[in-house]
Amino acid sequence: MGLGKTLTTIALHLHRAETAGETAGPTLVVCPASLITNWQREIARFAPDTPVLRYHGTGRTLDTDALDHTTVVITTYGTLRRDPALTATQWGLVVADEAQHIKNPASATAKALRDVPARSRLAVTGTPVENNLTELWAILDWTNPGIFGTRSAFRARYGAVEKDPNAPAAAGLARLVAPFMLRRRKTDPGIAPELPGKVHHHRIVALTDEQTGLYEAIVRDTMDKITTSSGIERRGLVLKLLQALRQINNTPTLYLKEPLDDAEPDGLARRSGKLAALDELTSTLADRGEAALVFTGYVQMGRILEHHLRVRGRSVRFLHGGTPPARRQELVDAFQHDPDPAPVFILSVKAAGTGLTLTRAEHVIHYDRPWNPAVEDQATYRAHRIGQHRTVQVHHLITEGTVEDHINDLLARKRALTDSVLASGEGALTELDNTELTALVILRKSAC
């Protein structure tokens, strides 16, 4: 979010090293692979005398005898799960960056992190609650084991807050966690007074005839199956339906799994209302000399967009989960300093929705809108963060009358409600009854 969490953590490390001396012990930072280089650079910038060891990749070695109270070791969640050397070392401070990675206490990542011996623990995240309050409990229980009781007891006591943020339990929960949380928001006085605003634009685009035919056919065929199924089978069919509709809304090329080699640029745009709208928008930005981030939830959609925009002559890059960490930083640096006046950076939401600073962009385009408001906000914050000097324009491409149009209405009308209900994304929608589900996915035709 750009509120100085990394800098605050570095300051904490320096404070411990200075006040406790050798008894402080070394600091271990565990983060997503995409953030290793960012941590190295921030430490070099603000604490240049601090020894830093990057413990990741093949050939890594950990000389515990060389670690002292001034040392910071940076590793990834993936390395932590696989490497016993990290759990065999006594750490003074363990930092879990983007701590939402441990929101599931039963996951291998959360279990591995619990096994790391440390005198102190610090969780760093911009989204302590993405889906439900159990995630908040998981993070707090890692930092302070046992203080907040069992997960089931915590949920029983405060679960009502998820459905009603104004429930009586909300005030009690706030008082309970306040001593253990340092929370900053961009709207807090003095935090980011120089940060410009952001403006949201909802671009409602029509489906093409091909998209309409595919959409209506998949709704008709799948709803027939859903109405005669139950339990796990029904939930699976609902998720499959929602994924298919989102892909059709993006472009038939994605849904039909067509090879890009055979995709003619003008043909791609003619087949997809969204792609045609993106063409128009990026052309306008190119004329103005303004850079943009384009977020998508599908890696293959990112490849389609990259192929399409490159053929259109745009300066374009694509970062996704399969991009090696070193290459990720190269892409970020290249975008931030691209001599082209209007570069486009395509990013998968899952791989790039947190941690990166991309203030070169003054436009954020959500090609397929995340149904989790917290995830969407985190992606937008890649550009709207400290260091940004221009108003950020946030564009949501929404296909008219479709399931994402219905979801957009909910997000617009009931933001507080969606934080608790829709925050779990498609999973919550599997619990709708057949009538509610039909109303959600049915294609509403325009009156004109």
Indicate where each model-derived feature is located.
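ASCE P-loop NTPase motor core, strongest for the SF2 helicase catalytic module
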Residues: 1-163, 175-195, 199-448
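Rossmann-like adenosine-cofactor binding region
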Residues: 167
